[in-house]
């Protein structure tokens, strides 16, 4: 029974990842005044399936000087972690209901760094290693601000459990009183998932393709799927934390539709940002976090603590 539950969560995610690639190509196409994919199937709808068949039927090529074991394990680990993070997300029922589900998600997203670092190191290519080191520095840096923002959210919620956020936001979405945190959180999720304008790991002009430059066929597809699964997961987490998913026990499907629609809107915002903004320089990326986001998030965290204590309205510890 548990295996069926796992499949009912995993398969829709993989399907969403496949069609997100199509939506991205279409969106970028229209923003650049062209059509995007429109040959394979009606309106290009079969393009992701054709891409999957092409990638998984090709022979993977291993560089002669690479560490073959790590080179193979890295993309598998990346996709496994990207899918594992979905387990505690309430949609409206989580696959695994953890008391510390928010901490679990932060810990799992931190582990993604290892798959990127291994892939860059195992490729034995200076471009791949440079991309991997950039990814590690970027991810670790932006996790600092994400963790501080999460702490502020937990103070408002009174619990690390994600299901409690729906009850906290029954009357008012937290995006309204905490909009500065929401803006910094959204920017941090862009950096955490290595998306434009923070895609320094894949700087085409200097690093060709970044940490996955030596990958082809199936292993490359696994990295690609992991990246897009992480994008959808981060947006789903943003919806849970800031844009309260209304939950009615009589009609849980309404809650799911509500949740999915908000996640789709945020994901389209990711694509919109990619089409609109140029890439940041590395020093600008680090300056933004350490000199702007970190002091602001710490100050807001102290503000939330002091307001709750001064008004004697600390939420119940669930």
Curated annotation (Swiss-Prot):
Biological process (GO) annotations held by this record are: mitochondrial electron transport, NADH to ubiquinone; mitochondrial respiratory chain complex I assembly
Localisation per UniProt entry: Mitochondrion inner membrane
Give the InterPro entries listed for this entry.
Answer: NADH_UbQ_OxRdtase_su1/FPO, NADH_UbQ_OxRdtase_su1_CS
Primary enzyme class: translocase
Q: Which keywords accompany this UniProt record?
A: Electron transport, Membrane, Mitochondrion, Mitochondrion inner membrane, NAD, Respiratory chain, Translocase, Transmembrane, Transmembrane helix, Transport, Ubiquinone
Does the keyword Signal belong to this entry?
no
Q: Which residues cross the membrane?
A: 2-22, 69-89, 102-122, 146-166, 171-191, 222-242, 253-273, 294-314
Per its record, the protein catalyses: a ubiquinone + NADH + 5 H(+)(in) = a ubiquinol + NAD(+) + 4 H(+)(out)
What are its E.C. numbers? 7.1.1.2
Give the Gene Ontology MF terms in alphabetical order. NADH dehydrogenase (ubiquinone) activity
Classify the protein's membrane topology as the record does: Multi-pass membrane protein
- List GO terms (cellular component aspect): mitochondrial inner membrane; respiratory chain complex I
According to its UniProt entry, the function of this protein is described as: Core subunit of the mitochondrial membrane respiratory chain NADH dehydrogenase (Complex I) that is believed to belong to the minimal assembly required for catalysis. Complex I functions in the transfer of electrons from NADH to the respiratory chain. The immediate electron acceptor for the enzyme is believed to be ubiquinone.
Q: What family is this protein classified in?
A: Belongs to the complex I subunit 1 family.
Cited PANTHER family: NADH DEHYDROGENASE SUBUNIT 1 (PTHR11432), NADH-UBIQUINONE OXIDOREDUCTASE CHAIN 1 (PTHR11432:SF3)
What HAMAP family does the annotation carry?
NDH1_NuoH (MF_01350)
The entry's protein name is: NADH-ubiquinone oxidoreductase chain 1
Give the species. Loxodonta africana (African elephant)
Gene expressing this chain = MT-ND1
